[in-house]
């Protein structure tokens, strides 16, 4: 569960290391984002030579959450951290690599490029 002011690790090589959620995209009163949902983030820390700089505002897709997510078959999945992958306006990832596993829910939300770059899909 990601809401406004939540800090997330950035799980790609775009240059950003940490980002803060500033808006959950969806219906007007939506408060929480889960795995596979789009959010708007502000980059809080970045590497000096990266494509993304500190202070940049970007869209992102949540790929891991510390709060467990229930699946249709009754199982739950949770991760040790909250993480997101930065995307552009065409919903393509900004980076060329994705670090760490991503949840199967990302595939169900049609972010195939992120799934193909991920080393593992759980």
UniProtKB/Swiss-Prot annotation:
Q: Which Pfam families match?
A: Ribosomal_L14
Which SMART domains does its entry note? Ribosomal_L14
Is this entry keyworded Transferase? no
Q: Which InterPro entries match?
A: Ribosomal_uL14, Ribosomal_uL14_bac-type, Ribosomal_uL14_CS, Ribosomal_uL14_sf
Q: Name one GO cellular component term.
A: cytosolic large ribosomal subunit
- What terms describe the molecular function in GO for this protein? large ribosomal subunit rRNA binding; structural constituent of ribosome
Task: Return one Gene Ontology term, BP aspect.
Answer: translation
Q: Does the keyword Transferase apply?
A: no
Stretches of the chain forming a coiled coil according to its record: none
The record's listing under SUPFAM superfamilies reads: Ribosomal protein L14
Q: Provide the alphabetized UniProt keywords.
A: Ribonucleoprotein, Ribosomal protein, RNA-binding, rRNA-binding
Q: Which PROSITE patterns match?
A: RIBOSOMAL_L14
Of which family is this protein a member? Belongs to the universal ribosomal protein uL14 family.
The record's note on quaternary structure and interaction partners says: Part of the 50S ribosomal subunit. Forms a cluster with proteins L3 and L19. In the 70S ribosome, L14 and L19 interact and together make contacts with the 16S rRNA in bridges B5 and B8.
The UniProt entry, under PANTHER family, shows: 50S/60S RIBOSOMAL PROTEIN L14/L23 (PTHR11761), LARGE RIBOSOMAL SUBUNIT PROTEIN UL14M (PTHR11761:SF3)
Report the protein's function.
Binds to 23S rRNA. Forms part of two intersubunit bridges in the 70S ribosome.
What name has this protein been given in UniProt?
Answer: Large ribosomal subunit protein uL14
The protein's organism comes out as Salinibacter ruber (strain DSM 13855 / M31)
């Amino acid at each position: 569960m990601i809401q406004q002011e939540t800090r997330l690790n950035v799980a790609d090589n775009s240059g950003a290391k940490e980002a803060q959620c500033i808006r959950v995209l969806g219906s007007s009163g939506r408060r929480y984002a889960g795995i596979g949902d789009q959010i708007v983030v502000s980059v809080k820390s970045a590497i000096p030579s990266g494509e993304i700089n500190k202070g940049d505002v970007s869209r992102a897709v949540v790929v891991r959450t510390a709060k467990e997510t229930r699946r249709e078959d009754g199982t739950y999945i949770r991760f040790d951290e909250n993480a997101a992958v930065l995307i552009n306006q065409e919903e393509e990832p900004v980076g060329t690599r994705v670090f760490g596993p991503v949840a199967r829910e990302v595939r169900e939300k049609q972010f195939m490029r992120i799934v193909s770059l991920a080393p593992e899909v759980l």
